[in-house]
Amino acid sequence: MTHSHAQLVWQDGQPMSAVFGDVYFSRASGLEETRHVFLRHNQLEERFAALPPSGSFAIAETGFGTGLNFLCAWQCFEARAPAGARLHFVSAEKFPLTPSDLAQALALWPELEPWSSQLLAQYDVLTPGWHRFVLAGGRVTLTLMIGDVLEVLPQLDARVDAWFLDGFAPSKNPDMWQQALFEQMARLSGPGASFATFTSAGAVRRGLAGAGFEVRKAPGHGAKRHISHGWIATPPDAGWQAPWYARPEPRWRERSAIVVGGGLAGAASARSLALRGWQVTLIERMPQLASAASGNPQGVLYTKLSPHLTPLTRLVLSGYAYSLRALRCLLPEDGDWQACGVLQLAHDGKEAEKQQALAELNLPESVMRPLDRDAASELAGTDLPCGGLFFPQGGWVHPPALVRQLADHPNIVIKTGRTALTLDYDPAQRSWTAGDEQGPLAVASVVVLAGAAETAQFDSTRHLPLKKIRGQITSIPASEESSRLRTVLCGEGYISPARGGRHCLGATFKFDTDDLGVNDGEHAENLAMLAELAPSLRASLDRDAPEHLDGRAAFRCTSPDYLPLVGPAVAARDFVHAYRELARDATLRPATACPWAEGLYVNAAHGSRGLITAPLSGEILASLLEGEPAPLPADLMRAVHPSRFLLRDLIRRKLDPDAL
């Protein structure tokens, strides 16, 4: 999981790779070469213009580099495509440029500034893994996969319309130009997919032909004699794929959705769909949005990581970067959020060992850096008992403000104070009706259940293993000394810099209770946590009598493996019947199509990480419904799939079909 930026040498103001000894683009005219090779020979102008009003187009690229190809494609798309069409660009990059190097490189093309400025505004959160950028008001999406192209493409779930086969020359970077690359291109190619590349090397042409592409030569640009281009002629046999992880075929008649739950998960799901032209009804049982776990006065963008490549760690890294980008686009950095950084203190020996292992991941200092006690105390503005890891781009956010902004879209209708008690599917109309005691609430093609633990209240989702964990936060008046706290402190709990003259700290974890009353005992627990985390800070908070304290309690919703549940729901009884033989032999490869609960999706169980994982999960659902490239690698998409527990229990013979 180590992370390395590109090592550049600048020659006459142009970037060159110090590792590969090759240029990123033509010294004579990189812009014209990109347009000649990749745009013209993929016929993008004509294909963009031919898109239907709500159509989409997917381009995949094998080396992002300076982003020049992406920006040129984006510029062309805006000029030629219908106003309602969408562009999705997927690119791999093993050695991403630093933000400053990228800005210097893109400054060479002032005519691209309207597009490059939008990219640069979001490019500074570069953790290892996959990154989703939402640009041009949601009309253009970039999925940047940081890693070796031969490792990330096998994890990509997409149907590509055009390939930009780009990278350093085969003679300079032979490890990339392998048959495995061409075979992955063929696997991911949709009907009629095209490709173009600057090279006409015989090995590349033969490799592409061997993978099923029709390959043609064409005149190159400038001093380049020939380039290669073509299209998929013989799509490969897809082979067996686990049907329970396949994408449901989109069968909706119109882009309409009901989202049940007005917290972060629901608002994020609604916005991702609305940005794609869906008409969304957002239903919340409380009088206002963000009334449950998303209603705390301050939440922390908290990236508690494992030094191992766990699915949760990888999901958190991608979600953290996405949430920060979303915040910067949606909320001004004022009283509703603050990028003050998060300091994760090494509060005991076990945590110190873990932090040492995390430091060896070689994450960029802009993402994470270790601090000793003195440096940590100076940065925080208060005396601390130990050092820790500092995440400079993190901070705190007022979750209700974020939820309101996510839900503020002309395609979203909000219905508060109404409880969706029933969900009925009409197969003839291919539509769902949500209703309460007064009658129908909304009718739509798709339903997204994002109501935390209440997601499992419906017949179609009772099998989901969701559990509630009570948490209470404490709000305490700031003192003169505590007002100098400049960053979020985290350990067994957290304390945020003051907002409106009060600090937020917490939160407790209580199992097996349905009580939501605020109590003095849990206030005392939160204050004791703070005394261990930052003794001098705790001592300065002298207005700690119960009459000065405020707080709120809510239920976190989590799953047995602490990963969220995001994706399509299954018809549980039919699922068990279809795959019952797996209980006898888990190695079987059944061909039976998965019995989905038609048009029903889930976005729940984000636990205490909702600010990190819920916004990106909205993109997961929208990508599935629209047939777009997935925002996460396939193994992570499986790790959060709602059917994973049903499948696991079936294999382990723990299911009682009559109880479903």
Curated annotation (Swiss-Prot):
Main subcellular localisation: cytoplasm
One Gene Ontology cellular component = cytoplasm
Q: Which GO terms describe its molecular function?
A: flavin adenine dinucleotide binding; oxidoreductase activity, acting on the CH-NH group of donors; tRNA (5-methylaminomethyl-2-thiouridylate)(34)-methyltransferase activity
Lineage top rank: taxon: Bacteria
Annotated stretches, region: FAD-dependent cmnm(5)s(2)U34 oxidoreductase: 260-660
Q: Which Pfam families match?
A: DAO (PF01266), Methyltransf_30 (PF05430)
Region spans: tRNA (mnm(5)s(2)U34)-methyltransferase: 1-233
The subcellular localization recorded is: Cytoplasm
Tell me where the transmembrane regions lie.
Answer: none
What's the Enzyme Commission number for this chain?
2.1.1.61, 1.5.-.-
Cofactor(s) the protein needs: FAD
User: Keywords in UniProt for this one?
Assistant: Cytoplasm, FAD, Flavoprotein, Methyltransferase, Multifunctional enzyme, Oxidoreductase, S-adenosyl-L-methionine, Transferase, tRNA processing
What's a GO biological-process term for it? methylation
Q: Which reaction does it catalyse?
A: 5-aminomethyl-2-thiouridine(34) in tRNA + S-adenosyl-L-methionine = 5-methylaminomethyl-2-thiouridine(34) in tRNA + S-adenosyl-L-homocysteine + H(+)
Recorded hits in SUPFAM superfamilies, A to Z, give: FAD-linked reductases, C-terminal domain (SSF54373), FAD/NAD(P)-binding domain (SSF51905), S-adenosyl-L-methionine-dependent methyltransferases (SSF53335)
In the record, the note on similarity to other proteins reads: In the N-terminal section; belongs to the methyltransferase superfamily. tRNA (mnm(5)s(2)U34)-methyltransferase family.
Function in brief:
Catalyzes the last two steps in the biosynthesis of 5-methylaminomethyl-2-thiouridine (mnm(5)s(2)U) at the wobble position (U34) in tRNA. Catalyzes the FAD-dependent demodification of cmnm(5)s(2)U34 to nm(5)s(2)U34, followed by the transfer of a methyl group from S-adenosyl-L-methionine to nm(5)s(2)U34, to form mnm(5)s(2)U34.
Quote the NCBIfam families the UniProt record gives.
MnmC_Cterm, PRK01747.1-2, tRNA_MNMC2
Q: What is this protein called?
A: tRNA 5-methylaminomethyl-2-thiouridine biosynthesis bifunctional protein MnmC
